[in-house]
C-alpha cells in the first residue's frame, strides 16, 4: 500500500494506470523528475526499477530519500516514535523561536507554533535516518492540519474562527500534531519495503537544465499544472515545509505578502512556451529513454501539442485517458498519460519484459488497495 497524502496533484489514485504504463518493459534505471509527493517514486522502486528522484522543493527531496532508503524491518516502533517525537515537540525551545516570532496567527495556533519550533531546534541532533523520518512525519501532520492542505494563505481563522464552513474537517484540523504524525507512521509500516536501499534523491530546479543528471531507461514526468487561471506554484503552496529542514528559513520570509512565504522558486512550468522548451530539452537529454508524462486535459498546454513534442525524432507517442476529479476542482477533468517510445525501443526484449512482469507480480500486494 502506498502511503496517502494531502499533497496536491499527487498521483496516488492513478498508480494502477501508471503501473500499466510502466509494465511490459525490461526493468532498468528510472527517474521521477518532478517527484512531488513521492508516490510514483515508491511505485517504481516497488516494481523493481533502480530509481532516482528529483524535486526542487527540499521537503519533497526528503520524502523521496525516505521512500528510496527505507528497508524492511528498518522503521522504529510506534511506541518508540511516540515517546521520542513527543519529547521533541514538548521540549523547551530556545529563543529566538522563529515560527512563534514570525508566524503567529497565520497557519497554526501559538501552541502548535511552539511545538514546531521545539521540533526544528531539537531534531538537528538526531541521526540522519531518524531526522529524515521525523521531518516526513511532521510535514504530513502539518498538511493534515491545514485548510486545503496548503500554506498559500494567511487563513488560520478558517480553522479556529466561529464561521460557517462548507469544506474541511475541524476535528482533523484540531487533532494534535503527534497524533497525525503517528497516523503517517502507521501508513509507512503497511508498505512491503524491499530489503535493500537504492537510488538517489536530488533537489534540482530543472529550469537550470539537465547536465548533472545521469542516463535512464525510463523518465517519468508529472510537472506542475498550468491551467486557465495560471500556474500551480508549488513553492508558494508548500514553502513552510522547507523550514523543517532549514530552520533559519523561517526568518527569511517575504514581508510584502500576508502569508509570509519563505521560499520563492521560479519554474519553467509557469509559462506554456518555456514549459514546451523544457520538454524539448528533456527529450534531447534522454533520447533513448521511454518518457511517460501525466497531465490534465484542460491545461494551457494542449494535449495535442504535448503529443507533438513527444513524437519528434521518430518517437511513437501513445495516449491513455482517465476520468478523474481533482480535489477543489470545479469540474471533472481527465488525466492524460502519454507514453513516448524511442525508435530503438520498438523491438522490446521479450525476456526482459517477462522478468519485469514477474517482479510486478511479486509486488501485487502493494497495489491491492491504492
Language-model features, listed with the residues they occupy:
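Conserved proline-anchored active-site loop of SAM-dependent methyltransferases
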Residues: 18, 30-44, 53-58, 212-233, ...
Amino acid at each position: 500500500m502506498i502511503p496517502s497524502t494531502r499533497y496536491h496533484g499527487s498521483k496516488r489514485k492513478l498508480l494502477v494506470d501508471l503501473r500499466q504504463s510502466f509494465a511490459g518493459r525490461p526493468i532498468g534505471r528510472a527517474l521521477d523528475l518532478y517527484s512531488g509527493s513521492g508516490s510514483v517514486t515508491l511505485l517504481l522502486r516497488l516494481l523493481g526499477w533502480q530509481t532516482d528522484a528529483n524535486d526542487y522543493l527540499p521537503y519533497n527531496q526528503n520524502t523521496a530519500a525516505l521512500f528510496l532508503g527505507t528497508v524492511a524491518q528498518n522503521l522504529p516502533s510506534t511506541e518508540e516514535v511516540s515517546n521520542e517525537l513527543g519529547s521533541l515537540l514538548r521540549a523547551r525551545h530556545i529563543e529566538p523561536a522563529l515560527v512563534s516570532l514570525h508566524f503567529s496567527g497565520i497557519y497554526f495556533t501559538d501552541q502548535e507554533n511552539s511545538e514546531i519550533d521545539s521540533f526544528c531546534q531539537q531534531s538537528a541532533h538526531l541521526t540522519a535516518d531518524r531526522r529524515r523520518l521525523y521531518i516526513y512525519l511532521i510535514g504530513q501532520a502539518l498538511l493534515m492540519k491545514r485548510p486545503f492542505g496548503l500554506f498559500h494563505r494567511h487563513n488560520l481563522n478558517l480553522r479556529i474562527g466561529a464561521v460557517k464552513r462548507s469544506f474541511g474537517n475541524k476535528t482533523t484540523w484540531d487533532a494534535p500534531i503527534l497524533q497525525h504524525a503517528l497516523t503517517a507512521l502507521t501508513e509507512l509500516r503497511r508498505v512491503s519495503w524491499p530489503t535493500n536501499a537504492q537510488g538517489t534523491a536530488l533537489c534540482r530546479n530543472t529550469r537550470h537544465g539537465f547536465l548533472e543528471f545521469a542516463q535512464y531507461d525510463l523518465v517519468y514526468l508529472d510537472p506542475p499544472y498550468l491551467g486557465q487561471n495560471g500556474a500551480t506554484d508549488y513553492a508558494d503552496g508548500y514553502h513552510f515545509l522547507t523550514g523543517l529542514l532549514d530552520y533559519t528559513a523561517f526568518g527569511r520570509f517575504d514581508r510584502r505578502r500576508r502569508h509570509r512565504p519563505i521560499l520563492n522558486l521560479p519554474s519553467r512550468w509557469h509559462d506554456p512556451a518555456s514549459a514546451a522548451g523544457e520538454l524539448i530539452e528533456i527529450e534531447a537529454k534522454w533520447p533513448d529513454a521511454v518518457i511517460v508524462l501525466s497531465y490534465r486535459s484542460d491545461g494551457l498546454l494542449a494535449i495535442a501539442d504535448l503529443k507533438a513534442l513527444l513524437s519528434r525524432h521518430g518517437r511513437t507517442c501513445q495516449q491513455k485517458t482517465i476520468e478523474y476529479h481533482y480535489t477543489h476542482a470545479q469540474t471533472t477533468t481527465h488525466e492524460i498519460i502519454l507514453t513516448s517510445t524511442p525508435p530503438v525501443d520498438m523491438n522490446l526484449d521479450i525476456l526482459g519484459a517477462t522478468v519485469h512482469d514477474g517482479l510486478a507480480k511479486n509486488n501485487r500486494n502493494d497495489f491491492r488497495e491504492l
